[in-house]
From Swiss-Prot:
Protein name per its UniProtKB record: Probable ATP-dependent RNA helicase DDX47
Gene behind this protein: DDX47
Gene3D superfamilies the record matches: P-loop containing nucleotide triphosphate hydrolases
Organism: Bos taurus (Bovine)
A Pfam family recorded for this sequence: Helicase_C
Family (UniProt): Belongs to the DEAD box helicase family. DDX47/RRP3 subfamily.
Length: 457
C-alpha cells in the first residue's frame, strides 16, 4: 500500500515538486549516483543534471519502474544509463541490461554514452542492429557484454538463431522512443522479446509522446510505474522562431535555394518525406554548389554514419533527411530546420523542429506549405496552439533563380536515372541486407562515381 501512496503523491505533486528539486539539487551526487559515475559525468562535461534526470534517477535508484515522457535533447539517455551502471557496479553481471531503440543511429549513440560513462569501470556494450554483418554480432554476443543495445527486428533474429544467446538473466529493460518503436510496427517483435526475458526485472520506458499504443505497452511491460514528465503538452521551445511559406509546389526547389542563400553561414537540416526526394534534392543542391549530404533509410549503415559524422564535424552545412533522422539523433548544431515536405503526422513537426534551438540557443524553423498541404498545416498550428508568421521573401529575387534551378533539376534527374540503372545491375549481382525503416533493398551509391568526377572538374 505504501508504494501506491507514494506513487499517487508523486503524481499529484509533480509540477511543484520538480520546481523545488531543481532549486535544491545541483549535482549528480545529490541524486544518489556513486562517485565513480559522478566523475565520469564531469569528464563528459555534464555539470548538472537535466530535469528528466533529476526526476527519474532517484526513483530508478530506489528500484521503481519508470515512464519518462521527455523530448529529444532532454538528457534522457543519462536518466536511464546512470541508474543501470550504478546497479551494475553493485551487482556485476553479464547481459545485465537491454536497451531497445527504433533506429540504428540511435543505438550507436546510446552505446557511445554507455561506454563513455562506464569507461573507468570497463563496461562492455554490443550494438545489435540491421545493416551490419550478423556473424560479427553473434561473436560480440558470445562474449556476453554487460549492455545490449538493439533494434527489435535484429535482436529477435539473434534470440532465435544465435546458439547460446539468451536474456534469461536480464535485470533491466529500457525502451527508448517507445512511441516510435511501435509506430514502426515492431509490436510483435517487442511482444516476443517480453516473453523471453525475466518477469522479475526493472523496466524504463521513454517516449516523447504518450500514445494509446504506448499506454498498452506500459500495461504489459511495467509494474506500478512512476511517471516522470518534463515536456508539457506538445510545446515547441520558446527560443525557436517558427515561420511558414505558402508557395506553389512547382517552385519549392527555387524557394529552398533562395532560403539557403539568404541564411548562408548557418547549418541547415532539411526534411523531405521520401528517400527519393531526399536524394534528388541533395543532388540538386550539390549541382548548385551547396555542400549537402543526404541521410535516409535506403543508405547502407556505414554511409549513414559517415553522413552524420561529416555534418557533426561541420564539414558539411546542409543535412537532408527523412523522418528516420528526425528523432533521437544527437546532432549538436542546427541553426535552421526547413520542412521542405510538410510532415503528414503533426506530432512529427514537433520532433523535426526540436533539432534546433537546443540547450538554450535560438533557432529558426521554416515550413513549406503548398496548395496541397493547407489542411496538414492547419493541424500543426492547432497542435502547437499558435499561428505562425510568414517568412519574409523577395519574390522577384526568388524568380531570378528559376533558370539555374531548372537546369540543376535536369541534372539531378539524369543522375538519379543513371544511378537507378546502375543499381538495378548491381542488385542482380548482390543481395541486400538493410532492414531498418522500410529500406526496400536499395543501397545509395550516389556519393561515389559521378559526383566525385564533378568535384574534380
Amino acid at each position: 500500500m505504501a508504494a501506491s501512496v507514494e506513487h499517487d503523491s508523486l503524481e499529484s505533486m509533480e509540477a511543484p515538486q520538480t520546481a523545488v528539486e531543481v532549486e535544491e539539487t545541483k549535482t549528480f551526487k545529490d541524486l544518489g549516483v556513486t562517485d565513480v559515475l559522478c566523475e565520469a559525468c564531469d569528464q563528459l562535461g555534464w555539470t548538472k543534471p537535466t530535469k528528466i534526470q533529476i526526476e527519474a534517477i532517484p526513483l530508478a535508484l530506489q528500484g521503481r519502474d519508470i515512464i519518462g515522457l521527455a523530448e529529444t535533447g532532454s538528457g534522457k539517455t543519462g536518466a536511464f544509463a546512470l541508474p543501470i551502471l550504478n546497479a551494475l557496479l553493485e551487482t556485476p553481471q553479464r547481459l545485465f541490461a537491454l536497451v531497445l531503440t527504433p533506429t540504428r543511429e540511435l543505438a550507436f549513440q546510446i552505446s557511445e554514452q554507455f561506454e563513455a560513462l562506464g569507461s573507468s569501470i570497463g563496461v562492455q556494450c554490443a550494438v545489435i542492429v540491421g545493416g551490419i554483418d550478423s556473424m560479427s554480432q553473434s561473436l560480440a554476443l558470445a562474449k556476453k557484454p554487460h549492455i545490449v543495445i538493439a533494434t527489435p527486428g535484429r535482436l529477435i533474429d539473434h534470440l532465435e538463431n544465435t546458439k547460446g544467446f539468451n536474456l534469461r538473466a536480464l535485470k533491466y529493460l529500457v525502451m527508448d522512443e517507445a512511441d516510435r518503436i511501435l509506430n514502426m510496427d515492431f509490436e510483435t517483435e517487442v511482444d516476443k522479446i517480453l516473453k523471453v526475458i525475466p518477469r522479475d526485472r526493472k523496466t524504463f520506458l521513454f517516449s516523447a509522446t504518450m500514445t494509446k499504443k504506448v499506454q498498452k505497452l506500459q500495461r504489459a511491460a511495467l509494474k506500478n510505474p512512476v511517471k516522470c514528465a518534463v515536456s508539457s503538452k506538445y510545446q515547441t521551445v520558446e527560443k525557436l522562431q517558427q515561420y511558414y511559406l505558402f508557395i506553389p509546389s512547382k517552385f519549392k526547389d527555387t524557394y529552398l535555394v533562395y532560403i539557403l542563400n539568404e541564411l548562408a553561414g548557418n547549418s541547415f537540416m532539411i526534411f523531405c518525406s521520401t528517400c527519393n526526394n531526399t536524394q534528388r534534392t541533395a543532388l540538386l543542391l550539390r549541382n548548385l554548389g551547396f555542400t549537402a549530404i543526404p541521410l535516409h533509410g535506403q543508405m547502407s549503415q556505414s554511409k549513414r554514419l559517415g553522413s552524420l559524422n561529416k555534418f557533426k564535424a561541420k564539414a558539411r552545412s546542409i543535412l537532408l533527411a527523412t523522418d528516420v533522422a528526425s528523432r533521437g539523433l544527437d546532432i549538436p548544431h542546427v541553426d535552421v530546420v526547413v520542412n521542405f515536405d510538410i510532415p503528414t503526422h503533426s506530432k512529427d513537426y514537433i520532433h523535426r523542429v526540436g533539432r534546433t534551438a537546443r540547450a538554450g540557443r535560438s533557432g529558426k524553423a521554416i515550413t513549406f506549405v503548398t496548395q496541397y498541404d493547407v489542411e496538414l498545416f492547419q493541424r500543426i498550428e492547432h497542435l502547437i496552439g499558435k499561428k505562425l508568421p510568414v517568412f519574409p521573401t523577395q519574390d522577384d529575387e526568388v524568380m531570378m533563380l528559376t533558370e539555374r534551378v531548372t537546369e540543376a533539376q535536369r541534372f539531378a534527374r539524369m543522375e538519379l536515372r543513371e544511378h537507378g540503372e546502375k543499381k538495378k545491375r548491381s542488385r542482380e549481382d548482390v543481395g541486400d541486407n538493410d532492414d531498418t525503416e522500410g529500406a526496400i533493398g536499395v543501397r545509395n551509391k550516389v556519393a561515389g562515381g559521378k559526383m566525385k568526377k564533378r568535384k574534380g572538374r
